[in-house]
Amino acid sequence: MAKYRIEVVRSAEKTLFSIPKPFVSKIIKAIENLADNPYPAGCRKFVGQKDTFRIRVNVYRIIYEVHDDLILIKVLKIGHRKDVYRY
């Protein structure tokens, strides 16, 4: 299986600066691991969304889209579990 390219939306990238440092490295590692396996154990598909998933990193969530045809993962949002689902 080919490695997926990872693209992080600017707003998600900015959110990393507001997250406490001990969690940032875990979040970055989880995102990097998506390149090898876009459907890791524990990932959940969003209901009503075609290719949108979420993974947990402690109390934080990473919301991302998988584009199998482009071999691309697009990270849409990163945030605390109480805030991340609000649009």
Question: Across the structure, where does each feature detected by a protein language model lie?
Answer:
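A short, surface-exposed loop/turn module that caps and links secondary-structure elements
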Residues: 31-55
